[in-house]
Structures are given as C-alpha cells and as structure tokens.
C-alpha cells in the first residue's frame, strides 16, 4: 500500500495526476512585482531599460517576466525590440547594438544573450497618430539572479512616446 507522505515527512497534496502518495517537489513561494515606466524615444536611436524588481529586494531570482509596451506613433513607422540577458551592466546602447536591425556587435557577443525579439509596425491614415502595443511573456529557464541583468532594447524610426510595464515573478 502506498504511503501518503512525502520525503520531508508531511502529507502530499492530491492532484488529478498524482492522486495518492508520490512525493512531490514543493514550489518556492513567488511574488509579483509590477513596474511602470514611460519615456519619449528619439528618432533613429537605440535605447534600453533594465527589467528588475523595484524596492528593497536584495536577493532574488526572476523566473518569468510579463512585458507590455504601448507606443503612440505615426502610420508607416517601425519599432524593433530585443530582450537580452547580460552578466554586466550595459553603459552604451549604440556601442553594443547595431542601429536598424538591433544585432549584437562583435565586441559584445560574449556577454550578451538574446532571449526574445520582435517588431511593431503601425498602419493607418496619414496625419493621425495610432497606438500600438505588444505583450510578451518570457520564461527565463533557471532564472536570472540579482547579479545578472535583463534589458529591453528598442530602436524606433520616429520620435514617439512609449509606456513600458512589466510584471516580474520573483523567487525571494
């Protein structure tokens, strides 16, 4: 007869997949931190911002990030974006990334890892601004600790206003 106790000596949860006594790995408690930023981006410029939990969180591990960006721009314009992981802080965006395509330059290829990429193109009637947005849910595998850095990098073909919100799922 199977026991209903797991290895730590406490009774396990019953789930449809594990109805009785198999041990299960208890999940680490996570917390969600929401960060809201807005900026005016210049034409033909590579800019970026760091994605990290705000506040007095000293030690953490980010497991996943939900990223939402809303852009207000003229029709026919383009915004490229990258989500990158880096072991050291990036001081100059134009020194690390090429301008229209957002490729990592050769001098920085050993320290920057591309996690996700995409583009936003606007359509509409000339003379009016349109609002576009994108949502990305990024799973970070083993996670990003407080010593590593996660950035979203943007290239815009026109000056525009961007509102960036991200929800960080943190294991504390």
UniProtKB/Swiss-Prot annotation:
Residues 11-20 have a biased composition (Basic residues). It is found in: Virion. One of its GO terms (cellular component) is T=1 icosahedral viral capsid. InterPro entries: Nanovirus_coat. It comes from the Viruses. Residues 1-26 are annotated as: Disordered. Belongs to the nanoviridae capsid protein family. This is Capsid protein. It comes from Faba bean necrotic yellows virus (isolate Syrian SV292-88).
């Amino acid at each position: 007869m199977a026991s209903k106790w797991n290895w730590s000596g406490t009774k396990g949860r019953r789930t449809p997949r594990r109805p009785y006594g198999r041990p299960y790995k208890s999940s680490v408690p996570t917390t969600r931190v929401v960060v809201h930023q807005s900026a005016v981006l210049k034409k033909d410029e590579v800019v970026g911002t760091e994605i990290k939990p705000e506040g007095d969180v000293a030690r953490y591990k980010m497991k996943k990030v939900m990223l939402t960006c809303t852009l207000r721009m003229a029709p026919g314009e383009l915004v490229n974006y990258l989500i990158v992981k880096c072991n050291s802080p990036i001081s100059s965006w134009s020194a690390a990334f090429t301008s229209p395509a957002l490729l990592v330059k050769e001098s920085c290829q050993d320290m920057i890892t591309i996690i996700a990429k995409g583009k936003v193109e606007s359509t509409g009637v000339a003379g009016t601004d349109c609002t576009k947005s994108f949502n990305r849910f990024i799973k970070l595998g083993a996670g990003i600790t407080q010593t590593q850095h996660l950035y979203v990098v943007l290239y815009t073909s026109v000056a525009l206003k961007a509102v960036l919100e991200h929800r960080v799922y943190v294991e504390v």
